C-alpha cells in the first residue's frame, strides 16, 4: 500500500487544474480487517416501524411486538442491499400495505433483499413470485425468506424483468431505477389482470413525469403519486374491460 501514496498525492495535486483549492492535507493509510467492514454496519441497524403495520427487524436482534396487529419482517441485508429504511423501500411498503386486501397474486420485480415479497406475504397475499437479474440478490432474497416462516412459499428466480413470465397478477411491484421501469411498463401491463395494480418506486423526482407519461401511453390509469424526500412512487391501474 505505501507504494500507492505518491500516485494518490499527485492526483490530489492535479485537482488544482480544475480550479479547486487544495489546502494542506495528510494522507493516512492503515489496514482494516475484512471482518470489521463486514460487521461494523450492524451497530447502526435496529428494529424500525416502517409503516402502520410493518416493522423491519435485523435477524440478529430479539424483538417483542409493540401491538397485536404488528407484522415483523426479519431481514439480514448483508453488505449488498439496503435495510428496508430507504425512502424508495418505505414508499413501496406503504403502497403494498394500502392496496393488498388478501389472497392476491403478486410479482416483485428486482426483488433485491426480498423485503417487498416478504411484506406482501405478511400483509395477506396468497402467491408471491420474486425476480431479480442478479444471482447475489436471488440468494439474499431466499436467505431472508427463510428468516420469515410465513413467507416460506415465496418463489424466487433469476430473470430479466418479466420476460417469459406468464403468471396473471393482481399486483406488480417494482422498486428499481426509472430507466429500468420504462421497459418494464408494457411487460407489467401484459401480465396484470384487468383492474390490477402496478406499484413502482425508485423514481427520482425529475424522472416522475417520464414514468407517468409512459404509463399513460401504455393504457394505465394513475391513481396515486407519493413523494418522500427526492423520491417518488406511483400506483397505476390496468383498466377493467368495461373501462377501456
Task: Map each language-model feature to its residues.
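Amphipathic, non-transmembrane alpha-helical secondary structure
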Residues: 9, 90-93, 97, 182-186
Amino acid at each position: 500500500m505505501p507504494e500507492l501514496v505518491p500516485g494518490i498525492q499527485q492526483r490530489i495535486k492535479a485537482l488544482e487544474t480544475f480550479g479547486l483549492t487544495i489546502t494542506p492535507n495528510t494522507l493516512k493509510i492503515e489496514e482494516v480487517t475484512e471482518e470489521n467492514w463486514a460487521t461494523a454496519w450492524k451497530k447502526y441497524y435496529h428494529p424500525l416501524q416502517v409503516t402502520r403495520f410493518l416493522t423491519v427487524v435485523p435477524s440478529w436482534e430479539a424483538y417483542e411486538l409493540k401491538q397485536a396487529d404488528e407484522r415483523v419482517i426479519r431481514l439480514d441485508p448483508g453488505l449488498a442491499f439496503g435495510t428496508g429504511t430507504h425512502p424508495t423501500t418505505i414508499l413501496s411498503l406503504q403502497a403494498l400495505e394500502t392496496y393488498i386486501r388478501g389472497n392476491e397474486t403478486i410479482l416483485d420485480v428486482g426483488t433485491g433483499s426480498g423485503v417487498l415479497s416478504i411484506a406482501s406475504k405478511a400483509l395477506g397475499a396468497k402467491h408471491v413470485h420474486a425476480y431479480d437479474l442478479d444471482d447475489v440478490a436471488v440468494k439474499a432474497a431466499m436467505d431472508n425468506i427463510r428468516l420469515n416462516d410465513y413467507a416460506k412459499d415465496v418463489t424466487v428466480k433469476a430473470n430479466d424483468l418479466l420476460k417469459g413470465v406468464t403468471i396473471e397478477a393482481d399486483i406488480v411491484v417494482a422498486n428499481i431505477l426509472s430507466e429500468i421501469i420504462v421497459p418494464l411498463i408494457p411487460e407489467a401491463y401484459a401480465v396484470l389482470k384487468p383492474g390490477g395494480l402496478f406499484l413502482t418506486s425508485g423514481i427520482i423526482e425529475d424522472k416522475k413525469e417520464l414514468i407517468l407519461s409512459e404509463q399513460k401511453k401504455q393504457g394505465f390509469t394513475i391513481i396515486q403519486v407519493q413523494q418522500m424526500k427526492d423520491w417518488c412512487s406511483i400506483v397505476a391501474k390496468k383498466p377493467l374491460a368495461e373501462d377501456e
